[in-house]
Regions:
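Extended repeat-based scaffolds of very large eukaryotic assembly and lipid-transport proteins
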Residues: 1-112
Length: 112
C-alpha cells in the first residue's frame, strides 16, 4: 500500500506507526491530534500487532520494534520500500513526551 508520507508500506509497518500514535488522515498516516484519536490509534495498532504476530509486548513500542527487527523478513517490518522512513518516525515518537505519557496511561488503564 502506498502512503503519501511514507511510500510503499507493509501492514506491520502501519501497525507499529499506529502504536506510536499515528492515525489515518485520508491517504496518509500522521501523528494523531488530540488525546482520544491518539489512544484509539494506539489501541488499534496494539491489537493489529498482537493478531499479526501472536506476540504481546503490550504498549511497549521499543520492545515491539526490537522484536520485529529481530524476526527479520518473517515479520516484514524491515521491508526496504518504506523501512527507513517508518523506522525513523517510530524512533522519533519514542522520544516524544506526549506519546510516552499516553502509552503509559494506556498500559496502566487497559490492564486494570
Amino acid at each position: 500500500m502506498t502512503i503519501r508520507n511514507f511510500g510503499r508500506v507493509v501492514p506491520i509497518q502501519i501497525f507499529l506507526l499506529q502504536l506510536v500514535g499515528y492515525e489515518w488522515k485520508g491517504r496518509s498516516l500522521d501523528p494523531a491530534t488530540g488525546g482520544n484519536a491518539r489512544k484509539r490509534a494506539m489501541r488499534d495498532g496494539l491489537r493489529s500487532l498482537q493478531k499479526s504476530t501472536g506476540a504481546d509486548f503490550g504498549y511497549n513500542p521499543a520492545a515491539w520494534r526490537e522484536h520485529l527487527i529481530s524476526t527479520g523478513e518473517e515479520a516484514g517490518y524491515k521491508h526496504p520500500y518504506a523501512f527507513a522512513r517508518v523506522d525513523q518516525a517510530v524512533c522519533k515518537s519514542l522520544e516524544d513526551p506526549t506519546v510516552i505519557a499516553t502509552l503509559k496511561e494506556l498500559s496502566e488503564s487497559d490492564t486494570a
